[in-house]
Amino acid sequence: KKYNKDPFHIQHALTVEAVMKWYASELGYGEDAEYWGIVGLLHDIDFELYPEEHCLKAPEMLRKAGVGEDVIHSVVSHGYGITVGCGATIDVAPEHEMEKVLFAADELTGLIWAAALMRPSKSTKDMELKSLKKKYKSKGFAAGCSREVIERGAEQLGWELQKLLTMTLQAMADCEDEIKSEMDAEE
């Protein structure tokens, strides 16, 4: 909250944190789940203060806070290959599986929440993969969520897109109550 105050950005950070912890457990990195979660929580630390320099200001901010270079690399790598508003292209590539999951799931969590908000339940818990895929294919839906980045992320992981969609939807459904209770506590 010190750096991102918009409730949407806070919810996004909490969502990515929870999804990253879920993935850590699912992929056999359970002992590192907290670490994966911290990277997810911090990944957009510079977004509100420096939207035109997203991923470029994060290292300085995180170093000032005493965060290690491993976390900084992971945070910056979620923007790999993306040209930000100031014209710079992020050149720090995701290397570890955790960084590749973050790269792939970041944009996708936004698209899944947007799809959930269109549902009568406003929930991911009752969302079927078929419904998500339909929204995903509609380029005008949640247009700010880059399908290209999501697809590149699946490719980096060596996964079919359907696997990424299925797993991230399941992660969000499993974590939804936790995310909502954290958001309620923020109010």
Model-inferred region functions:
Residues 2-6, 95, 158:
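Active-site oxyanion-binding pockets that recognize sulfate/phosphate
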Residues 9-13, 17, 51, 55, ...:
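Generic structural signal for well-ordered, non-membrane alpha-helical segments
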Residues 124, 129-184:
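C-terminal binding/interaction regions
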Residues 1-50:
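Acidic/His-rich, divalent-metal-binding segments that scaffold phosphate/diphosphate chemistry
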Residues 1-7, 18, 24, 80, ...:
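Metal-centered catalytic cores of metalloenzymes
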Residues 29-141:
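Divalent metal-dependent catalytic cores for phosphoryl transfer on phosphate-bearing substrates
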